[in-house]
Amino acid sequence: MYDISGWKHVFKLDPNKELSDEHLEMICESGTDAVIVGGSDGVTIDNVLHMLVSIRRYAVPCVLEVSDVEAITPGFDFYYIPSVLNSRKVEWVTGVHHEALKEFGDIMDWDEIFMEGYCVLNPEAKVAQLTDAKCDLTEDDVIAYARLADKLLHLPIFYLEYSGTYGEVELVKNVKAELKQAQLYYGGGISNAEQAKEMAQYADTVVVGNIIYDDIKSALKTVKAVKGE
């Protein structure tokens, strides 16, 4: 079994986006610590299965980030369950999770499942619009969500999600200083190695996503930038 606490760099692949076999091989053989499969829309059992089969040709750990109960399938190493803490809709905080547990609770392997406390900070992002996230937050607001995830809910992961735009480094630094046990994931807007390295100073795990589809070479350079190899 893999130890997620040691993951410094992960790639996130959207099953609803096209990725060539060549580029997928580059991603899986890049030295990244893991590949997360997940997206905000268009996620189906068919495209998740296609992605799973493709990734399983390689040794890299793979994780399904569950956004739709209908797209859950066995075969992944881990399953990340996001709870959008700053959503205005209870379904995205605990509602969908309750439905999943009602349907699959008896057969879940709890050693494979990790809850993520999301704080979505880009109002233009699909995930913000889908979940009706309250994004006009002060730093105190964000730190309060971090404390909620870390100290009250004891979640293993607190995820700062800027999705498509590069975040505030100082905020990431201050959030990290608040966390005692939760692992800090940062995702959003990383388009080059320098940005990845900058965020890696404070985030435990840097998530690289959109740049994979826009500039594969720049995406690959983020691995060494984060891991310092």
Swiss-Prot record:
It catalyses: sn-glycerol 1-phosphate + all-trans-heptaprenyl diphosphate = 3-heptaprenyl-sn-glycero-1-phosphate + diphosphate. One of its GO terms (molecular function) is magnesium ion binding. The keyword Lipid metabolism applies. GO terms for biological process: glycerophospholipid biosynthetic process. Keywords: Lipid biosynthesis, Lipid metabolism, Magnesium, Metal-binding, Phospholipid biosynthesis, Phospholipid metabolism, Transferase. Its cofactor is Mg(2+). Its EC number is 2.5.1.n9. It comes from the Bacteria. InterPro entries: GGGP/HepGP_synthase_I, GGGP/HepGP_synthase_sf, GGGP_HepGP_synthase. Pfam families: PcrB (PF01884). Mg(2+) binds at residues 14, 40. Pathway: Membrane lipid metabolism; glycerophospholipid metabolism. It is an enzyme of class 2 (transferase). Sn-glycerol 1-phosphate binds at residues 12, 159-164, 189, 209-210. The keyword Manganese does not apply. Homodimer. Prenyltransferase that catalyzes in vivo the transfer of the heptaprenyl moiety of heptaprenyl pyrophosphate (HepPP; 35 carbon atoms) to the C3 hydroxyl of sn-glycerol-1-phosphate (G1P), producing heptaprenylglyceryl phosphate (HepGP). This reaction is an ether-bond-formation step in the biosynthesis of archaea-type G1P-based membrane lipids found in Bacillales. Belongs to the GGGP/HepGP synthase family. Group I subfamily. This is Heptaprenylglyceryl phosphate synthase.
